[in-house]
A protein has these predicted regions:
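Catalytic cores of Mg2+-dependent Asp-rich isoprenoid enzymes
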Residues: 1-152, 156-246
Length: 246
């Protein structure tokens, strides 16, 4: 697997949940996250749009051409082969990331918000489920729902940061933030129904990730208004809260 652990660096809530996975499974989940993070970082870095498009095209070409000199590419293809992951899921992820490589991003409807959330996060939940040996259709749908729920949490948390990057996924007022958290709750609830289908050795880790990430939404709601929300900076779950939620 890749030398740099992006999961530990960028996704501390997920990394905490990953602590409860078997070591080999954690490595596979980490390799998946590495691939998604490297792709996403291209859209998020400070280069010009032209440079970002060139870098993203090169990354996609490396994937399509199976450039195994890049460990990130080799690892994702190993996961695809081992877990029977459809490349359509990867292409859906690419579509989501590509939609962020613009001078300005603006989503106008709930449908657009949910499509975007599926592409950049529901896909990841689906691939993660395949790694965790989940194969029933309803269970895979629950994995997509959990990914969407977490992305809606991200969007609700990062309104100011996204605006500074010329991205408007939801309007900048607390009512919209609150309604997005409420929408995420529907997806968190729907993600729970098939949890029993996850193999027992993996189940606790997914429950922890779900509880810890959901907690972010509750903390956002506790800000009560947009002024408090703006003053709070990036809202996260601290280590003590993670232990409590676990």
């Amino acid at each position: 697997m890749s030398a740099k652990n992006y999961l530990a660096t960028y996704a501390k809530s997920f990394n905490w949940a990953g602590f409860f996975l078997p070591k080999d499974t954690y490595k596979k989940c980490s390799a998946l996250y590495d691939f998604c993070r490297v792709a996403d970082n291209i859209a998020d870095d400070e280069n010009t749009i032209t440079v970002k498009k060139e870098k993203f095209k090169k990354f996609k070409d490396n994937f399509e051409n199976k450039n195994f000199t890049d460990p990130i590419i080799k690892n994702i293809w190993d996961l695809i082969y081992e877990n029977n992951i459809s490349t359509k899921i990867i292409h859906d992820l690419f579509d989501g990331i590509n939609s962020d490589i613009k001078e300005q991003v603006k989503l106008n409807t709930k449908k657009e918000l949910l499509i975007y959330s599926y592409r950049v996060a529901g896909t990841v939940g689906l691939m993660m489920a395949k790694i965790l040996k989940v194969d029933k259709k309803n269970s895979l749908k629950s994995a997509i729902n959990l990914g969407i729920a977490m992305q809606l949490t991200n969007i609700s948390r990062d309104v100011i940061e996204d605006l500074n990057n010329n991205r408007i996924y939801i309007d900048q007022n607390f009512e919209n933030i609150k309604s997005t958290i409420q929408l995420s709750e529907e997806f968190y609830e729907n993600s729970f129904y098939s949890i029993k289908e996850i193999p027992l050795s993996f189940r606790f880790s997914i429950l922890v990730a779900r509880r810890v990430y959901r907690k972010i939404g509750y903390k956002i709601l506790n800000k009560k208004n947009f002024e408090n929300y703006k003053k709070s900076g990036k809202i996260y779950v601290n280590n003590t809260e993670k232990i409590v939620e676990t």
